[in-house]
Amino acid sequence: HNGRRRQRQMCIRDSPLRQNNPAKMPLLIAILAFLFNIVNGYFNGTHLGSIQGYSIEFMSNWNFILGVCLFIVGAYINIKSDNILLSLRSKSGEYKIPEGFMFRYVSFPNYLGEILEWMAFAVMTWSLAGLSFMIWTMANLVPRAIKGHQWYHSKFESYPKDRKAIFPFII
């Protein structure tokens, strides 16, 4: 019973409903996100619905094992980074510079983690559907990270100059 209660507490603690100042999303972004999920849901559902192409032995292939490892790393980066960002939220709406963990290297490690998760899915399924989801995710998150990175630099004079937007030491 304690495990279930802890799971419920975690779900409530991490819920978007709990955020003090949730940012408003433009309608166009919401519509594009909806369309993105419809298209990718169709491609991946169609691919995974014809699962007869995968045998149980497939799970011992190098690409599946590598994909699982990448997914674990990506999920850890994503969740830990989101928790750091959530801890910075204040009731006053004041912005703070995120520090520590992957924030030492990039402004948006949560986006990096999500990209790694979908890269892992593409590697695990070794499919065009998985690859397309990874590419769509990158096409969405990389420009957002670059724009957000520029915003951080304009908002904070003390923002770390050597920190990249999304990929450590690269972009």
Please identify what each model-predicted range represents.
Residues H1-D14:
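Single conserved hydrophobic/aromatic residue that forms the stacking wall/gate
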Residues M10-C11, L35, Y42, Y76, ...:
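Generic N-terminal leader/processing signal
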Residues R13-L17, V39-Y54, S81-I84:
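Membrane-helix exit/interface motif
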Residues D14-I29, H149, F156-P160, K164:
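Interhelical loop and helix-boundary elements at the membrane-water interface
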Residues N21-G45:
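Active-site pocket-lining segments that scaffold enzyme catalytic pockets across diverse folds
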Residues G53-I171:
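Hydrophobic transmembrane alpha-helices
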